[in-house]
Amino acid sequence: VGLARHADHWEATLRGPEGEKTVMARAVVNAAGGWVDEILGLAEPGTRQQNLRLVKGSHIIVPRWHEGDYAYFFQNGDGRIMFAIPYERGEFTLIGTTDVPYEADKDKVEISQDEIAYLCAGASEYYKRSITPADVVATYSGVRPLYDDHAANASKVTRDYVLNCDRTGGAPVLSVFGGKITTYRELAEHALKELGPDFPGMTKPWTKSASLPGGDIPGADFEDFLRGLSLRHPWMEQRLLRRLARAYGTRVDALLGTAKSTVELGRDFGGGLHEAEVTYLMRHEFAQTAEDILWRRSKLRLHLSESEQASLATWLERQVSA
């Protein structure tokens, strides 16, 4: 909530459940997404930041709409590309996406009825069965924090990332604009390279050949990895084991611990979500709420009834407050 620049360091004021505290750092990396301009405003009080162009992208989820494990790309009538992807074990189809200029509250981003109609109509041009808003079982939306290159059409705004490192008046602040998940690793290495002069002891880049947490599967052979898991945990139902293996990779053994039966995984909240997995997510992936677990860390909300979701929320509240 506060930034103060000095010749060789920054003082940042952080606010959390336990109040405020001040920390010091030699540099600030401003990777705040849609809030990057607000952070720059803290770093440079009194200046007006207008570096971002916010573009909303929304998706709809419908029951499985085509056979096979294929993803499809469609050319929409307005020239945009749409896609339909098998989703959540192939039980659903994910259809996206939209490009809508956005100036509303970034904390409350939701799909509009016009976007739902747009996606249904666009996909229906290619499916034998038309998709209607009544078929939509879930939606999600996000705001793309794109660098404002002053393109007239929201779909034409650059998706490339832009880095801006400012050392005016003291310690550096590196701001990240735009970018996509497909370039996140390269972006991160580029950011560190920009800060190299400020950290002479920085090591050389190493992430290109490094696995993500849980991704160090021998030979990158998932099916062979799954067979090994089945041998180590013969008591587990294969559908559940496959989901956990896909979600957690080599970390699945840490999640399962010493369990020798499904009963030892603890309470079953529905949809194959057990207490052991919830506890793992709370301890290792910062999950605090039912929404964290059912939507942000997974998409299991699609498989739980409303009463099951409510039971999970109640259980979590007790755990967090204990």
Regions found by a protein language model. Give the residues of each.
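C-terminal catalytic lobe of FAD-dependent flavoproteins
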Residues: 43-95, 100-320
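A conserved short coil-to-beta-strand element within the FAD-binding core of flavoproteins
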Residues: 1-11
